[in-house]
Amino acid sequence: MTFALGQRWISDTESDLGLGTVVAMDARTVTVMFAASEENRVYARTDAPVTRVAFNVGDVIECQEGWSLSVEEVIEDKGLLTYLGTREDTQETEVTLREIFLSNQIRFNKPQDKLYAGQIDRMDNFVLRYRALSNQYQQHKSPMRGLCGMRAGLIPHQLYIAHEVGRRHAPRVLLADEVGLGKTIEAGMIIHQQVLSGRAERILIVVPETLQHQWLVEMMRRFNLHFSIFDEERCIESFAESDNPFDTQQYVLCSLDFLRKSRKRYEQALEGEWDLLVVDEAHHLEWSQDKPSREYQVVEGLAENTSGVLLLTATPEQLGRESHFARLRLLDPDRFYDYEAFVEEEDQYAPVADAVTALFSGVKLENSAKNQITELLSEQDVEPLFRVIEGDSSEEEQALARQELIDNLMDRHGTGRVLFRNTRAAIKGFPKRNVNLLPMDIPTQYTTSMRVSGMIGGKMAPEARAMKMLYPEEIFQEFEGEDSSWWQFDSRVNWLIEKIQDKRSEKILVIASRASTALQLEQALREREGVRATVFHEGMSILERDKAAAYFAQEEGGAQVLICSEIGSEGRNFQFANQLVMFDLPFNPDLLEQRIGRLDRIGQLRDIDIHVPYLKGTSQAILARWFDEGLNAFAETCPTGRTVYDKYSDVLIEMLASGNTEQLDEVIEESAKLNQSLKSDLEKGRDRLLEMHSNGGDKAHEIAEKIASTDGDTNLVTFALSLFDTIGLNQDDKGENALVVTPSEHMMVPSYPGLPYEGATITFDRETALSREDMNFISWEHPMIQGGIDLLLSEGVGASAVSLLKNKALPVGTILLELVYLVDAQAPKRSGISQFLPKTPIRLMMDGRGNDLSAQVEFDSFNRQLSPVNRHLASKLVNSVQGEIHKLIEAGETHVLPKVEEVRQQAQKDMQTNLNGELERLQALKAVNPNIRDEELEVIEAQINELTGYISKAQVQLDSLRLIVVSHN
């Protein structure tokens, strides 16, 4: 390296220092001053990590005074360069600029500048960058975007609803699936799609207080969406940042009670400018024409101010038509304006459902059914289809004609677009429940303490006393103190220990009402028999619960028993277990259903054993009999349970409080009758049409298969591991399909997006991720991959590289130049541009004569023939052919333009086909189905105009390049 005072050099290792000037030299060292960053560096002369900055004819360079010069000649004198050329601002010719006056801020952002300045990256980084661009492009174009990356089983009806609703602009729908069919997951998938496509940036979820935790966990665990729970305390804290606390976070979760109680907070939430509002347990919003409840008004206000609304409810409309209408009214007040009109319209659907049932079953259509169909659809539409169905066409044609009729009827179906409801009856794949009710003798210690408690109990409200009598172990502790070892003599504990020993190879889930009972049971199992058990209760943090759940899920060396309290178990699913023990019973049927729902979910592969040990002659015995004989709530799901409970709760509470069972048989008999009649009403009113529409039929299975085929993508695994390597993360293989990824000291950036400070355990396998909640499920949509790709591209990793091609068929020294361009339409994310024209890479492979060989030379197979070059040699190679590289880049510019035009035209065509198709369908439907909102049509028209503008203005720029030189050795 020859240095001279006044020369300009750039640091290879600290490119952000700017342009440096040689200010001092001695025999062994050289001092370079970087004026832009006010830093000096002293290097050894022999191998200083710096590169000489020399510009060529054709470059545009900037002077310290701010003007630019287009270089026409370069003169070297005693190691210093002087540039001659034309000033860009005044057009003055033959202006000279000595290199000492070059701007200190010059950064080499363009890939060719980096190449000339010797900032040459490793070859594998260039490959990684190209793969990042290609994969990012494919992900954006995929119609399944937003559905592949969530940690959930691929269940067809859920995927269908999410796919159907998630792609709409500002969806307003009611998700009314029965318990255990996964409404929360459906809502999460819709939110996830809306977030990824940029349609929803601000989201508010309103849920009952007891479910806040569950939603927080589900959104974070399954979809990597980090919500913040807002309560009064949080709002006061946020006041420092903003007048409206709701503006401090994009994703907010709060309880309905919190908004109902505080008018101020409710008004602030109204001003929050949300894109999407999600309300869980919407059946609690009571409404009547003259007197809507305060809760209902709160949600109504929010729904009026928010463009997208998802309401979730488990209560079927047959159990309350008025409240069902009220929920639909929240979604579209213009359409559902009058309850009487709604009832009348609903009654007209009964014949539609009959007609569809007839079509589905494939029986010959009666004339009456045909007339009904003709009344609903116009005659010229249906006549040819009837002819096909009744003629002697092939079975396939008949099936298609039936399907077309069904689709047309579906589209006309009043609430088809706003309401989705799946029932267990319509969806296969649920386990059978084996129920074991186990009456046990009551220990004398309990009888004594309960008797004494009854005598000194004084005036307690019946409800409080009923609650108390359900838990004899707590009454005993009141007299004997907290430390009393009730579990030494409780017959249920003795039975439980035997059961655990009997089922050594099975995982057992035990649920008790109170956290204290759960903790004491764990102690009992540990101290009496050394059983490996773990506890789960509301006093634990999310992380502690995760660890407990993971310990329970572990195949080898994990806990055999997990003991949960009532609240602690909310929202957690343990499908891998099939033994459920109810140590005591909850007060109402909803909670009972929730307990069984921890195991009895879609995706459970085995039948479930439900064990209910209870003490004879106690309140528990009364409750066990009523649940079993009155509701049959242990053996099957009980959507009617709540209604029956509301009717008989007073009598039940009285019985539980006093222990008097005279009326029990009568109450059980009446409950069973009422339950039966409600269930048959439900069955009669089952809206087959709605069910068919909600479960998506074959289409749903296609979506599930499509996503399943992308699981286990080896391309993703290879890419992720190279990405983590390049950015500098440590990776340790942990077995069981898992890796541990931790930050290292040599990272490219101080913190890696999506990775906690202490690292994370990751898996690429969906099944593993489902059984182990402590692992991150890595997919193309995971923040660690998305964030990593963004980091790669923004930090300029792999923008320029040099490789050798050992090929005796070509003369030594032949050069090839690989150019990767990026077509980018500068448009806001919410415009939906990424679906039609995401950032699109175009690869060219220029030979020495300026021809493009990319069509003949495929990237991967060519890349395997190349070998890397060290930086020093790479710089020399670049300097020796710099002039030729210039010419090839110019040739590349002309080759790429027609390709950019093709990309634009294809994007425009895709967009027109997609959006015009949707627009025409909605316009045709609007004529017959009042459920289509005008606003939806206007939005699509505006979107077409807006996108046409963005696509036509899409720009292209050179993103990265690689010089390839042929050698023979």
UniProtKB/Swiss-Prot annotation:
Residues 492-679 form the Helicase C-terminal domain. Coiled coil: none annotated. The keyword Hydrolase applies. Its EC number is 3.6.4.-. It comes from the Bacteria. ATP binds at residues 177-184. Residues 164-334 form the Helicase ATP-binding domain. Keywords: Activator, ATP-binding, DNA-binding, Helicase, Hydrolase, Nucleotide-binding, Transcription, Transcription regulation. GO terms for molecular function: ATP binding; DNA binding; helicase activity; hydrolase activity, acting on acid anhydrides. CDD domains: DEXDc_RapA (cd18011), SF2_C_SNF (cd18793). SMART domains: DEXDc, HELICc. It is an enzyme of class 3 (hydrolase). Pfam families: Helicase_C, RapA_C, SNF2-rel_dom, Tudor_1_RapA, Tudor_RapA. One of its GO terms (biological process) is regulation of DNA-templated transcription. Interacts with the RNAP. Has a higher affinity for the core RNAP than for the holoenzyme. Its ATPase activity is stimulated by binding to RNAP. This is RNA polymerase-associated protein RapA. It comes from Vibrio atlanticus (strain LGP32). The gene is rapA.
